[in-house]
Amino acid sequence: MLISTVMTTRRDALAAALALLTEAAASAQAQKGADPSTVFVHDLPNLTMDDWQVTVSHVPYAPGRVGQTHHHAGFVLAYVLEGAVVTKISGQAERVYKTGEMFYEAPGATHEVSKNASSTEPAKLLALIFARKGDTLTTPGPATSAH
């Protein structure tokens, strides 16, 4: 699986990442001929962001692709660019997210299910992973301790 990644360490990384997501959401809305609207609202962890960075990854899902159980050191904002993705994060119900929808993963939460909802169409996800500099971003398997 190919994942393209861009990293930044500037203090305005959060603002830049949210601007990127806003642009992606606005583009998806414009293609549908609708007015811009709120796509996602979620409280973020109480943290300072000093010595943190954001990593933006493009995650393609081939038809029928099933990802492995994993967790992240930091928190994740994920935006579905194309298709539909089935996800289940520890403590939550399994859910299908379609083009233009987003979800949040708390630091250390286990991503139990991550798969393409279609066996015939591809899906694409844009993942913004916010973590401390030097942390391993994605670790296979369930989290063994709370972060």
Located regions from the model:
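Boundary at the C-terminal end of the N-terminal hydrophobic targeting segment
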Residues: 26-30
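Histidine-centered metal-chelating micro-motifs
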Residues: 66-68, 86, 103, 107-116
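N-terminal secretory signal peptides and thylakoid transit peptides that target proteins
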Residues: 2-21
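A short glycine-rich, His/Asp/Glu-containing loop-to-beta-strand
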Residues: 34-68
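Short acidic-glycine-tyrosine-enriched beta hairpin
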Residues: 91-108
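Ligand-binding loop in jelly-roll beta-barrel domains
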Residues: 108-135
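Glycine- and acidic-residue-biased ligand/ion/polar-headgroup-sensing regions
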Residues: 74-91, 101
